[in-house]
Every structure is written in C-alpha cells, then in structure tokens.
Amino acid sequence: MPKKTEKNLLVGLDIGTSKVVAIVGEVMPDATIEVVGIGSHPSRGLKKGVVVNIESTVHSIQRAVEEAELMAGCQIHSVYAGIAGSHIRSLNSHGIVAIKDKEVLPGDVERVIDAARAVAIPADQKILHILPQEFLIDNQEGIKEPVGMSGVRLEAKVHMVTGAVSAAQNIIKCVRRCGLEVDDIILEQLASSYSVLTDDEKDLGICLVDIGGGTTDIAVFTEGSIRHTAVIPIAGDQVTNDIAVALRTPTQFAEEIKIKYACALTQMASADENIEVPSVGDRAPRRLARHTLAEVVEPRYEELLSLVQAELRRSGFEDLVAAGIVLTGGSSKIEGLVELAEEVFHMPVRLGLPQYVTGLVDVVRNPIYATGVGLLLFGYNNREQRVLEAGLGKGLKSVWERMKGWFQGNF
C-alpha cells in the first residue's frame, strides 16, 4: 500500500463542548474520501461551544490528534476546525455590479460578492462565511454558475455568517499550540450539512438540527442553498444536568445513564424496566424505573425542540422545509427523539448519519461524527474550488486571504 502523503490527506477537527474528535481522510484516485483514522477525547476546556480554558482544550486536541495519527499511520500538520457558540450571527445580503465586458468573468463574481459583503457588522465580529445563494443577471433569477453568461447587470444573494473575533482566535491559538496549522474555520452546522444531507433534501427544503453537548446548531436549506443559520445555547449537557439533579447522582454517572437508558418519549419507556442509579458520596446505589428517567428527559428535549420550532418560525422558512427535519449530533442519539420531534414539528423527521465517505464506515456512521466527517468533505470541496480558481486566474479570494484578518496582529 502506498505511503500516505500529506498532499492527499485531509483532517477534520471537531472541537466540541463534550468531546474533541479528529478524523483523518485520504483522498483516493477516484476522488472519494477514505476515513483512515479517528481520535476522540473528552473535552474539558469549552463551555457552550466557546473556549474557556486554553490549557485543557490544547490537551484534549493533542490526545485526539495523537489517537487519529496512530490509527492512520501518518503525521498530521494541518486541520479544518469547526466553530460554534451563541456568538455566531447570520444575515442575508445582496450586491449589484455592472458587467464590464457584457460577459460575466470570475472577477465580476468577486466584485459582486464584495458588494454583498459591504454591510455593517460589529467591531468584535468577523465574517466567517459568505455563502452564495443565487445570482441574477438582468433580473433573471436562479442562476448558480454565472461565469460565461451574457448580460449587463449582475446581482448576488448571499448568506453571511459572522463569529466573535476572540472565539475564532482562541480556537486558532489552541490548534497552533499543538503544533498544527488551521486550513480553515467552518461553522459546525454547515460542516454537518455536507455529511448528512442529500442534494434532494436541500432542493426541496430541509432544516438540519445538530444537537451537541453545549449548543444546538440549526441550518435551513431551500432551493439548494443555505438560507438561515442559528445557534441555541441548550443541548445535551442540560439534559445530563437535569438527570444529575433529579436522580441525585454525580454528573459523570448522569451522562452514562443518559447515553445507555434515556428515552425522549415517556410512552416508549417501560415502567417495568429498572435501572441502577449511583448515589452521591458513599450512599448505596438505588434502582429506579426507566419510565421515571424518561419523565425527566422528555420535558427538556421538548423545550429544546420547541425553541428550534420558534427559531424556524421566526426565520420565515417553516412552511418551506417540505423535506422536514434532520436531527444529528451526539445528543440526537436518544431513543424516542425522532418520534418526539415528529409530534412537535408535525413534519417528517429522520436521524442524520454521516455518508459520502468510505473506509471506517461502521465507526463513522454515527451522528457523533457528523461534524468531523463534514469538515473533511468541506475541506475537499474547498480544495477542489481552489484548484478551479487557480485555473481561472482571477478567482474568488483564497481561503488564506479570507482568514488573514483572524491572524494579523494577534500572535
């Protein structure tokens, strides 16, 4: 087997509130991505998706990366890192320019996107992504690839995502402290959408709900493009905390109980099935009905799903997501959650498992790895885009140019 070279390796680094996951993918000759290494380590230095302790975060990243390197038999030099947290903001914008030579060139696309990004954002926020939704040429709508088309006026509709400068700088700082470079920083639900959604769903209209430990991340797609993103600061950690308080058990045992026995719909939990609950201090463990646990878990998940529904309504896209809801993320793997979500949303709901990769498929087909696999796929698409831009000459701004603002004067 040929030795893996740095050139055909991609690494996704999902720095989450409850765990750090590193996934190594090798780009194969047939342009598929084979997952060759996975590393995971509990995360201690983040709260609600934001770094609060650099040393702890660095330690978690190092352990996850070392495990992935060992499995893949390679050395990791750079990563695509995810970003989340309630500091994330998003808005839809548009720009208009005149087409110089009556035919759209890559430079015209760059100018119209620059025009679309010319909106006032707070000084403590930086643009993370400018995601084109569609282009219009002389009022002709629905154009995805304008280069080469004729016209005199070019418009762009874009979705802009911004994040706190300090939050992004701290992620970069933690990764660099591990001796690694950051290829790009990607919004986590955008990454997850690459691995769990189909093109048909994005065309028809879909709402992705990525339930992690610290945050629940939402992304809405219609007509093949991203239309709305949001972050809700309630997720799996709140469920764990509810279990710990209600059952009077230490947090680490509450997390284990949630993973093994939790059910999000009380009517699906048997009243006859008992579970053992460790007590605080040196008190003896107790036995409780699994039904009792479900009575603790269901209200929190119902509250979370109601907040997602309220956000979807506020965005104005609730009636446009004909394909329904896709749940993913580590805290979506709870029995009865899909059924509860169908009751709340009154639309089809499915669990999103990572796809579009080969290799360690049995391991990665788990919602826990949705963001990690998505970061690989985003990285690959991005790399292909840069090759295309290099061929076109004057293309859109490179990732490095786009990210320079994060680094300058900060280290």
Which residues are covered by each model-predicted region?
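Short glycine/threonine-rich loop-to-helix capping motif typified by GTGT followed
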Residues: T198-D200, G330-V344
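Glycine-rich beta-strand-to-loop/alpha-helix junction loops that act as flexible
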Residues: A81-S86, A323-K333
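Short beta-strand scaffold segments in enzyme catalytic cores
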Residues: V20-G25, T216-V220
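Conserved structured catalytic cores and adjacent interaction surfaces
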Residues: G205-C207, A219, G224-R227, V231, ...
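Hydrophobic, well-ordered secondary-structure elements that form the walls
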Residues: V308, L327, L375
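Nucleotide/phosphate-binding catalytic cleft detector across ATP-hydrolyzing
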Residues: M1-T17, I23-L208, S225-I226, G236, ...
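A general structural motif
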Residues: R300-Q309
